[in-house]
A protein has these predicted regions:
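Short, glycine-rich nucleotide/cofactor-binding loops
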Residues: 4-20, 32
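Short beta->alpha connector loops
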Residues: 12-15, 37-41
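Short, charged, surface-exposed secondary-structure boundary motifs
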Residues: 17-18, 63-69
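Short, conserved loop/helix-junction motifs that constitute active-site signature segments
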Residues: 24-29, 45-52
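Short internal beta-strands
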Residues: 33-38, 53-60
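Short, charged/polar "capping" segments at the starts of alpha-helices
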Residues: 40-44, 62-65
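C-terminal structural segments of small proteins and small subunits
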Residues: 66-94
Length: 94
């Protein structure tokens, strides 16, 4: 089990910038981020360039029309559950 933190970012389009400000202050190297819902629409935000482990649910990626960044990994629901269990700390930001 990883001692790093898994951040679950789920927000509406208009509240995403404030949520990203919070997580950017908490994020440490080795942490992972999962984008959920409208949060995937902020994929071009500069914060995500420093995230070495970035995920999004495959269902939510259907919201994007541009090609996916190479550092963004798609998750189905089973792998999402496994990912959550792999981290000792999981923080959900909405």
């Amino acid at each position: 089990m990883s001692q790093n933190t898994l951040y679950l970012l789920q927000s509406g389009f208009h509240t995403t910038p404030a949520m990203l400000d919070k997580v950017s202050r908490l994020y440490s190297e080795g942490d992972a981020v999962v984008l959920m819902g409208d949060a995937v629409l902020a994929i071009e935000h500069p914060f995500f360039q420093q995230c070495s482990t970035l995920f999004a649910l495959e269902h939510d990626l259907e919201l994007l029309v541009q090609p996916l960044p190479a550092h963004l990994h798609s998750l189905n629901y089973a792998t999402f559950a496994e990912l959550c269990l792999a981290y000792s700390r999981c923080i959900s930001l909405k």
